[in-house]
């Protein structure tokens, strides 16, 4: 049996110290990762949530390929605004009412896995109707100004003309809407009476939006949106890419970037 020399003992000690340092370094890395994930989760729950625009229902204000930040604090918090929808909140906490004209993200009333983004048109107790394409709130037509028609190109490359209107809600909120067709299916509706604790939502692209005008059962629409389903308020377009952007073609991340929409505030 070979006896250990002083040098062997020194080497063993150094090796043990190195292993301890490696374990400590690995532990610090894990702690840093967990801390970063915790901060990200807290921010997503209480501050901002990212969201992307999948359809053209909110044109002209929001485009397919827009990536938004949705603020969580404006209306308080509910199951819908927390990841995985834990059943710890029955309705909302720190609740604040939505305002007419706000652009909000919400969970579909019949499919809480699906997020929608629309504009708030009707508040609880309101009577909403559409007559000849013009919104009527509590018997009063929403003032609108005809703008010059616009030639637009959709995501399939089709170019067409659309009428544009500038609407002004009773609280003074002004925004632009598209109206493609003179007699679209929901250009004339019955009166909708918004129940307590619910809101009436519409897309700005009026003839290409499945919203509160459509019955959730009979027409596969949205219907009234309960306040518990509100996720947050759309605040800012952080980034935006057009249809040329491809994940597997990194150069298109720059050539397809809509530079004029970077950090673009949402009206």
Predicted regions and their residues:
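Acidic/histidine-enriched ion/cofactor-binding microenvironments in catalytic or ligand-binding pockets
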Residues: 56
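Hydrophobic membrane-insertion alpha-helices, especially the h-region
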Residues: 31-48
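Soluble "head" domains of membrane/secretory-pathway proteins
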Residues: 2-27, 46-47, 51-52, 60-267
């Amino acid at each position: 049996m070979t006896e250990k020399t002083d040098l062997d003992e020194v080497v063993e000690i150094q090796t043990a110290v190195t292993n301890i340092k490696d374990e400590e370094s690995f532990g610090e890395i894990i702690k840093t990762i967990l801390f970063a994930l915790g901060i990200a989760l807290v921010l997503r729950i209480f501050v901002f949530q990212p969201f992307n625009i999948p359809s053209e229902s909110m044109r002209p204000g929001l485009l397919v390929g827009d990536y938004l930040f949705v603020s969580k604090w404006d209306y308080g918090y509910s199951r819908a605004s927390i990841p995985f929808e834990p059943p710890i909140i029955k309705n909302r906490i720190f609740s604040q009412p939505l305002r007419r004209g706000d652009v909000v993200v919400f969970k579909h009333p019949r499919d809480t896995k699906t997020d929608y983004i629309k504009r708030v048109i009707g508040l609880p107790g309101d009577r909403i109707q559409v007559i000849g394409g013009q919104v009527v709130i509590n018997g009063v037509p929403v003032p609108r100004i005809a703008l010059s028609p616009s030639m637009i190109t959709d995501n399939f490359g089709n170019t067409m003309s659309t009428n544009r209107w500038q609407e002004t809600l009773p609280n003074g909120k002004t925004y632009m809407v598209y109206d493609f067709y003179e007699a679209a299916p929901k250009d004339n509706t019955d009166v909708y009476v918004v129940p307590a604790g619910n809101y009436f939502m519409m897309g700005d692209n009026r003839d290409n939006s499945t919203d509160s005008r459509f019955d959730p059962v009979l027409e596969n629409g949205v219907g009234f949106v309960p306040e518990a389903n509100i996720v947050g308020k759309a605040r800012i377009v952080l980034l935006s890419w057009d249809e040329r952007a491809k994940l597997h073609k990194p150069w298109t991340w720059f050539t397809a970037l809509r530079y004029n929409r970077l950090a673009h505030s949402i009206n």
